[in-house]
Structures are given as structure tokens and as C-alpha cells.
Amino acid sequence: PYTQNTFRENWIDDGNWACDNNSFTERSQRFFGNAFLKYSTKFGTDNHKLDVKYQIGDDAYTTNYSDIYGYGTTGYANGYASEYGFTVNEMNSLLTFTYNWNINEDFVFDALLGNELVDKRISNTQAVGYSFNFPGWNHLNNASVFNSSHEYKRKRTVGNFASLSLA
């Protein structure tokens, strides 16, 4: 079972053999959601109004991959396994203050003040193994040569904004 009859070029696995000995999987999990709070007041008058609004949202997901080339595959005669994945978490926060003042029939003052924060975190993990020790156990733990790596990145963006108008 660890040798194959191939009628194509020597770098292409036989289709039936590959189905029995090679595997490729992808698994993903995801969560996302948002919420907001809003407060409004007219200060007991008809010509002033203040709105304060806070919004927060999150998008978090993990995807893991596994690529297995079984013992006897044409590209890696003694087998090859790769498991890699990434996790991403992106949080967004927005706070705004909106003020409106009707000074008189001719003038209206509007003000907007805000702050936005976007925080993104990415984690990558990879493990690769070559040359399986035993045929029939196509798994990363069976590799005689093993390499792994991990990378973590974080990016934070902050923005402040304001607008004033008198019309």
C-alpha cells in the first residue's frame, strides 16, 4: 500500500491512492457581534440637545489547516505533514458626542466630537514534519524531521475627529 502505480508523470499521485493516503482539512470557528448605548438630553429646554453614543463590536475567528501526504507519495516518498492556523481578533470602539443649539431663527450651532479605536491581533502557528518513521501512521507526530514557528502581530489604530458649524 505504500507504493503506487501511476500512469502519469512521476510527480502526480494516482487518484485512488491519494484519496486513501493524502488528506487536506480546513476548520474554522467565528464569533462576531456588536452593541451600543445611547444617552440623549435636552437640558430641560427646547433649543439645546446632546446625544452621547458608544458603540463596540468584535470579530474573532480561528482557521486551522492540516495537509498530509502519506508515506509513499510521489513528492515526499517518506511522507509529509503540515499543520498551520491563524487566529484573528478585531475589536472596534466608537464614542460620539453630538450637540445641537438653536440660537435663534437665523442661527443653529452644531458640534460633533468623537473617538474611534480599532485593535487587531493576529496569531499564526505552523508545524511541519518530514520523513515519517513508520508507514501507515500519516501524522505529524510520526515525523523524524520537525520544524515549528509562531508569530504574533498587533495593530492598533486610534482616530479623533471633530466638526463645528454655525449656520
What are these regions, as identified by a protein language model?
Residues 39-41, 58, 101, 117:
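Short beta-strand segments enriched in hydrophobic/aromatic residues
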Residues 35, 52-56, 111-113:
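Membrane-embedded beta-strand positions of outer-membrane beta-barrel proteins
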Residues 49-53, 68:
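Composition- and surface-driven signal marking solvent-exposed, interaction-prone regions
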Residues 25-26, 30, 70, 74-167:
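Outer-membrane beta-barrel transmembrane domain signature of Gram-negative proteins
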Residues 1-32, 155:
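Acidic/polar loop-and-plug regions of large Gram-negative outer-membrane beta-barrel proteins
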Residues 42-50, 102-109:
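Short loop/turn motifs that connect adjacent beta-strands in outer-membrane beta-barrel proteins
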